[in-house]
Structure formats: structure tokens, C-alpha cells
């Protein structure tokens, strides 16, 4: 894509607001200067700990006398989210969909039921085709930052691939979010055909594991194999 759609722009603005508010909190709590350069969001730094999370209500009530910030928050955060079932997680992943113009139709993986059955199901991907992955999810109560979807692919017990999709930051909404990955090409050739086990994880910058599941993938010469 050459530009940003409304969802991507909103996610980036939401992340900027979160970082600005976290900076204020850190400055107020530490009674000193800004955080050290080493204290950055980097998974390669094992000692990194994310700043204390502020609830959506706390963010709305922060700096009530700052009119410009209050206006910015009203535009960005929108109305208060409707009440939801308290038993639901804050982030609810509903579906994973394989999209390909060369496929007979979308290949849909339902993630709202018994995830254990997915390990015994086989999702077919035709070799050499162009495809994208659509991730559908809901955010119910609090802002979530740095969502990412990871896929570890195994064959005969050995990991042969690791894919990470950076999904972004989102606020609570009654509407379901959809994130579509860039176009990729499926591998081809006799050496790559056959069954695989994929271990998937939906997580965020706080390393909260919102959902993890295993599923079967088979790269075949045709969609019906």
C-alpha cells in the first residue's frame, strides 16, 4: 500500500498518545530525567519491562485541565466502549483467514471454539500461489499496544520457519478489527510439499499471551489434495 487507511492511521495516533502519556507517568514517578537510552522496547533486552499500564478510564481522566490534550483524547479515543461480558478477554481473536485469488474461496480457521481440534485438522495451501492472511479480533475494554501474531512452523519435529506479523495498537470498539498481511508466495517444489505443524501465538508489547493454538498445514500441488 502506498498510503495509510483510516484504521492504520488511527492505530498510529493511538500509539503516539500512549507513548506521550507513558512518558508523563515515568517523569512523574522517577523524579529525574528521561529514561536511559537502553530502556527501549526491544525483545532482545531480557531485562526490559514495559511502563506501568494505565486503564482507559485513567487516560481519560489524566490532565483534565489540558484542553488541547482533552480534545485530542476525545477525537482519538471516541466514546466509552459499551459494557461487555466480563468473562470475555480484553483481546478476543476470532478468526484466521487465508486469502488467495487463486484459491476456490477463502480458507477460514474459527478460533472461538475448541482450539484442540485444530491440531487434527489440515488446512491446504497450494504451492507457489500468492496469498495473504487476515486476522480478525476484538478489543473489549482497554487499549492494547504492539499486538503481534507469531507463527512457528515445524516439520518432523524441527522448526523450519518463524513468521511475525506486526498488527499494531488498538482501542476498545464494538466493531471487530481486521488486519491483512502483505502478499506472500507459498513455497514450491517436491522438497517442501507435505504436512507441517504450526504453533501460533497472539501477543503484545506487554508479552501478554492473548491466544495460542496449534494447527495442521499441508502444502500440496492442488487445493483439493
Curated annotation (Swiss-Prot):
Keywords attached to this entry: Cytoplasm, GTPase activation
Tissue specificity of this protein: Primarily expressed in pancreas and brain.
GO biological process, one term: Rho protein signal transduction
Keyword Ligase: no
GO CC terms, sorted: cytoplasmic vesicle; cytosol; membrane; plasma membrane
GO molecular function: GTPase activator activity; Rho GDP-dissociation inhibitor activity
Main subcellular location of this protein, as a coarse class: cytoplasm
Pfam families found in the cross-reference section: Rho_GDI (PF02115)
Cytoplasm listed as a keyword: yes
Superkingdom per UniProt: Eukaryota
Compartment(s) where it occurs, according to its Swiss-Prot or TrEMBL record: Cytoplasm
Family classification: Belongs to the Rho GDI family.
Role according to the record: Inhibits GDP/GTP exchange reaction of RhoB. Interacts specifically with the GDP- and GTP-bound forms of post-translationally processed Rhob and Rhog proteins, both of which show a growth-regulated expression in mammalian cells. Stimulates the release of the GDP-bound but not the GTP-bound RhoB protein. Also inhibits the GDP/GTP exchange of RhoB but shows less ability to inhibit the dissociation of prebound GTP.
Name of the protein described by the UniProt record: Rho GDP-dissociation inhibitor 3
Annotated source species: Homo sapiens (Human)
Encoding gene (name): ARHGDIG
